[in-house]
């Protein structure tokens, strides 16, 4: 009873803190950057991380196994992944735009887990025989961490596309790979006091320069986070194959979950390949990552909605004993 009460308290505290973090972030978007508000935002995400960590540890102690056995627990772990991804650049003293996606993703994920799922799915249960393995921690944790990283990176790519196409900016050209194609330029006339000759000088407006810097940062962080997520996904798939061979006698069965995991891996492998081509970067590679965003959700929720296949124990459908 104590563990359940503590879990309930930590769930509501973490949800409340991340809600406040989003509010603070909206304020920083409406006004000029304020150091105090920025620090409060970062401290809020750290507090959220600690609360969710306490929630997972409490559930682990109560259930006796790593809390990754059903959809509710995986969503909480996914929310935890968003918070830890957000803190990585913070401890390196790098200001970034990850909070644009990590905080909303954390509150959406945790909100859906606590309010969108049936109450019965919140309860810890004895692991089914297929999950009673040491590979549970390795495989499932790597997969959920990869989902978190790939979702964050994909959302950054979506933000890049929105800014690029809305403002009609083409920042990656074929000639020097970093060409500003359609920035707005202001024409300023000034008088040379010595020669009294009028000269027309074109200069890059400060607003567009900031937008250009923002796009570069989004592209850079998207690439970094997706690369990290791709590593996690690869480890998760390989460990899952070994686990499948031990449990079912085959490394690969083309189960719906396995199939979509392979499709997800292929999409982001294509994305990383496009990054090696200097003529196919920026908005072009961001389109591939945006497609990957949809594929991830199909992979993560598709099997759960269908309730079929070898991974059906994590579905929305609750089977009666």
From Swiss-Prot:
Any idea which UniProt keywords this protein has? Answer: Chloroplast, Cytochrome c-type biogenesis, Membrane, Plastid, Thylakoid, Transmembrane, Transmembrane helix
> Can you tell me where the transmembrane regions are?
17-37, 44-64, 71-91, 98-118, 143-163, 225-245, 258-275, 286-306
Provide the topology term for how it sits in the membrane: Multi-pass membrane protein
Sorted alphabetically, the Gene Ontology cellular component annotations on this record are: chloroplast thylakoid membrane; plasma membrane
Q: Which GO terms describe its molecular function?
A: heme binding
Q: According to its UniProt record, where is this protein located?
A: Plastid, Chloroplast thylakoid membrane
Instruction: State the protein's purpose.
Output: Required during biogenesis of c-type cytochromes (cytochrome c6 and cytochrome f) at the step of heme attachment.
Q: Under which name does UniProt file this protein?
A: Cytochrome c biogenesis protein CcsA
The record lists the organism as: Buxus microphylla
Taxonomic lineage of the native organism:
Eukaryota, Viridiplantae, Streptophyta, Embryophyta, Tracheophyta
């Amino acid at each position: 009873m104590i563990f359940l009460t503590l879990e309930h308290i930590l769930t509501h505290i973490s949800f409340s803190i991340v809600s406040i973090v989003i509010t603070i972030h909206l304020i920083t978007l409406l006004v000029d950057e304020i150091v105090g508000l920025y620090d409060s935002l970062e401290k809020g995400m750290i507090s959220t991380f600690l609360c969710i960590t306490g929630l997972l540890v409490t559930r682990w102690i109560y259930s006796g196994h790593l809390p990754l056995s059903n959809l509710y627990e995986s969503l909480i772990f996914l929310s935890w992944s968003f918070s830890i991804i957000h803190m990585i650049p913070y401890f390196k003293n790098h200001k970034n735009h990850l909070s644009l996606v990590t905080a909303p993703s954390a509150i959406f994920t945790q909100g859906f887990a606590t309010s969108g799922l049936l109450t019965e799915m919140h309860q810890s249960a004895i692991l089914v025989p297929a999950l009673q393995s040491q590979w549970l921690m390795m495989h499932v944790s790597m997969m959920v961490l990869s989902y978190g990283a790939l979702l964050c990176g994909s959302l950054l790519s979506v933000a890049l596309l929105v800014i690029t196409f809305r403002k009609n900016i083409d920042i990656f050209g074929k000639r020097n790979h970093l060409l500003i194609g359609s920035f707005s330029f202001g024409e300023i006339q000034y008088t040379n006091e010595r020669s009294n000759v009028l000269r027309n000088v074109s200069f890059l407006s400060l607003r567009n320069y900031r937008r250009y810097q923002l796009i570069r940062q989004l592209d850079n962080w998207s690439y970094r986070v997706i690369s990290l997520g791709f590593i996690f996904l690869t480890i998760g798939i390989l460990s899952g194959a070994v686990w499948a061979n031990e449990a079912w006698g085959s490394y690969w069965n083309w189960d719906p979950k396995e199939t979509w995991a392979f499709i997800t891996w292929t999409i982001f492998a294509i994305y990383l390949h496009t990054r090696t081509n200097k003529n196919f970067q920026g908005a072009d590679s961001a389109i591939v990552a945006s497609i990957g965003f949809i594929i991830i959700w199909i992979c993560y929720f598709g099997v759960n909605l269908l309730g079929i296949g070898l991974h059906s124990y994590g579905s929305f459908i609750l089977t009666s004993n």
